[in-house]
Amino acid sequence: MTQNTFFPIFPHQHLLGIKDLNVQDLIVLLDRANANIPFSKKIDKKQSPLHGCTQINLFFEASTRTQSSFELAGKRLGADVMSMPIGNSSVKKGETLIDTATTLNAMKPDILVIRHSCAGAAALLAQKVDCCIINAGDGAHEHPTQALLDALTIKRAKGRIEGLTVVICGDILHSRVARSNILSLNALGARVRAVAPSTLLPAGIADMGVEVYNTMKEGLKGADVIMMLRLQRERMTDSFIPSIREYFHYFGLHKENLSYAKSDCIILHPGPINRGIEIASDIADGPQSMIHTQVEMGIAVRMAVMEALLDSRLKASGEKK
């Protein structure tokens, strides 16, 4: 890794969740990500701070945006990137997560990016391996890089985060994105609201500093930012809503519901989008939508995270760069 003096204070060697970061940590990562945007669009051999580093992506859950984003982020930084094909791996033959991690650790990677259906999987690996761990989503627990890219998208669109009213709508119960965003947005000074049917709200959400509403009309009043969440039917074992049609009418984002928010509000969605379920196509593709911008910001954010973690590890180990 080449000399990098951009991170004077970033004490973390893993990114397991937003809960582990303070406001200064968030600002450092967002500032670096913002600086990375010009370099996130193509490989620049003159800007290769991760040259000679190895990044392994270990996705136990299907992913398009997040896995591709991490692959591109590593390559933009000059890292050697390997994505493990879980479908053909020893995991399918009964190998445990710990055994897989131990095997990969023997290969001496510098970064291990993991997505897993079990909450705490990334934290468990961090105790077992010698490299930097990045949580790319663990069950319904956290998705820290998604929260960071959402914050960067908001800040670039609105010029600030502090003082904004951000409304998170939809399947909050099953959403790791919601949890990470609540933590980051509260820390950065936003006013956070949640709108969902009571069956899709986690217990104790109000204790996280969130204003809770059960109607879009009330919840979207004065909204600067609307963040729609996918209805995660694959995680549902019971009937949480009467019907898709009724859910879209009352809790989907269509013209009538959007009219309750500020006229200049922006719309976010972590993807994948279920058109006609949580958001109408004309809204998802409309001028207020920042969905494609979020994807673009994701590469810059993940570049910043990898740089920061490796820089911190090298400083802690006393290695000469």
Curated annotation (Swiss-Prot):
Entry protein name: Aspartate carbamoyltransferase catalytic subunit
Residues annotated to bind carbamoyl phosphate: R65, T66, R115, H143, Q146, G271, P272
Organism of this sequence: Bartonella quintana (strain Toulouse)
Name of a matching Pfam family: OTCace
GO BP, sorted A to Z: 'de novo' pyrimidine nucleobase biosynthetic process; 'de novo' UMP biosynthetic process; amino acid metabolic process
GO CC terms, sorted: cytosol
Enzyme class: transferase
InterPro entries: Asp/Orn_carbamoyltranf_P-bd, Asp/Orn_carbamoylTrfase, Asp/Orn_carbamoylTrfase_sf, Asp_carbamoyltransf, Asp_carbamoyltransf_Asp/Orn-bd
Upper taxonomic lineage: Bacteria, Pseudomonadati, Pseudomonadota, Alphaproteobacteria, Hyphomicrobiales
Binding locations of L-aspartate: K93, R176, R230
Catalysis performed (reactions): carbamoyl phosphate + L-aspartate = N-carbamoyl-L-aspartate + phosphate + H(+)
GO molecular function: amino acid binding; aspartate carbamoyltransferase activity
UniProt xrefs under SUPFAM superfamilies: Aspartate/ornithine carbamoyltransferase (SSF53671)
EC number, as in UniProt: 2.1.3.2
Key words, A-Z: Pyrimidine biosynthesis, Transferase
Family the UniProt entry places it in: Belongs to the aspartate/ornithine carbamoyltransferase superfamily. ATCase family.
Pathway(s) of this molecule: Pyrimidine metabolism; UMP biosynthesis via de novo pathway; (S)-dihydroorotate from bicarbonate: step 2/3
Purpose: Catalyzes the condensation of carbamoyl phosphate and aspartate to form carbamoyl aspartate and inorganic phosphate, the committed step in the de novo pyrimidine nucleotide biosynthesis pathway.
Assembly information from the UniProt record: Heterododecamer (2C3:3R2) of six catalytic PyrB chains organized as two trimers (C3), and six regulatory PyrI chains organized as three dimers (R2).
